[in-house]
Amino acid sequence: MAKTSLKVKATRHPKYSARAYTRCQICGRPQAVLRKYKICRICFRKLAHEGKIPGMKKASW
């Protein structure tokens, strides 16, 4: 889990656009963040399994 200070820091608008980076809105993880949902792959998978993301279901082929 990320520190609270890092979560707050990520929400602020940076002075230079190159300093901006995505961070998961739920857990604060900086890697593997899905831009469309603004959450990391781990939280995305958890929410999808719980049925909290509409229209999302496990793929099977």
UniProtKB/Swiss-Prot annotation:
Record carries keyword Ribonucleoprotein: yes
GO biological process: translation
Domain of life: Bacteria
Record: residues binding Zn(2+): C24, C27, C40, C43
Cofactor dependence: Zn(2+)
Cofactor details (free text): Binds 1 zinc ion per subunit.
Signal peptide range in chain numbering: none
Keywords: Metal-binding, Ribonucleoprotein, Ribosomal protein, RNA-binding, rRNA-binding, Zinc
Cellular compartments per GO CC: cytoplasm; small ribosomal subunit
InterPro entries on file: Ribosomal_uS14, Ribosomal_uS14_bact, Ribosomal_uS14_sf
Pfam families to which the protein is assigned, alphabetical: Ribosomal_S14 (PF00253)
Entry similarity comment: Belongs to the universal ribosomal protein uS14 family. Zinc-binding uS14 subfamily.
Protein role: Binds 16S rRNA, required for the assembly of 30S particles and may also be responsible for determining the conformation of the 16S rRNA at the A site.
Oligomeric form and interacting partners: Part of the 30S ribosomal subunit. Contacts proteins S3 and S10.
Protein name as catalogued: Small ribosomal subunit protein uS14
Native species: Mycoplasma mobile (strain ATCC 43663 / 163K / NCTC 11711)
Record gene name: rpsZ
